[in-house]
């Protein structure tokens, strides 16, 4: 559950006809900072009517190796076949705002909702985004 009045950094994420808002919640200076989600019930619904949204969360959290996951952005691989989340984490468990920037691949679940998996420490090498089908420049 997110602390009241501590929701920030909303980002829109669209998967086909599904609309999500992923946002940071909690206290940004603590290791419990995390991401939660709003899902629009129907794409034809009024976006400004709160009854048209389903609130769920947390959808992406820290763990024993990663602290204070928050402020996400989303992109795709150069060839458009993969989805990536860009986010920050705390450097350590102590209160404060020292951050690491992280990037990892995510998928959309069977119901079309984003599934971010487990937040990975910065020491874990991530695969490069897919570039298949794109002309590669040789140096």
Q: What is the predicted function of each stretch?
A:
Residues 4-139:
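Carbohydrate-active catalytic/glycan-binding domains of CAZyme proteins
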């Amino acid at each position: 559950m997110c602390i009241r009045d501590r929701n920030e950094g909303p980002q829109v994420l669209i998967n086909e006809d599904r609309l999500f808002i992923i946002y940071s919640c909690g206290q940004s200076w603590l290791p419990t900072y995390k991401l939660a989600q709003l899902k629009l019930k129907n794409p034809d619904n009024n976006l400004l009517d709160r009854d048209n949204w389903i609130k769920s969360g947390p959808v992406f959290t820290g763990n024993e190796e990663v602290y204070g996951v928050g402020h996400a952005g989303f992109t795709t691989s150069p060839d458009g076949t993969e989805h990536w989340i860009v986010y920050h984490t705390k450097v350590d468990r102590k209160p404060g705002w020292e951050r690491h920037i992280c990037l990892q691949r995510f998928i959309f679940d069977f119901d079309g909702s984003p599934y971010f998996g487990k937040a990975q420490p910065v020491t874990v090498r991530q695969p490069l985004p897919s570039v298949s089908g794109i002309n590669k420049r040789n140096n």
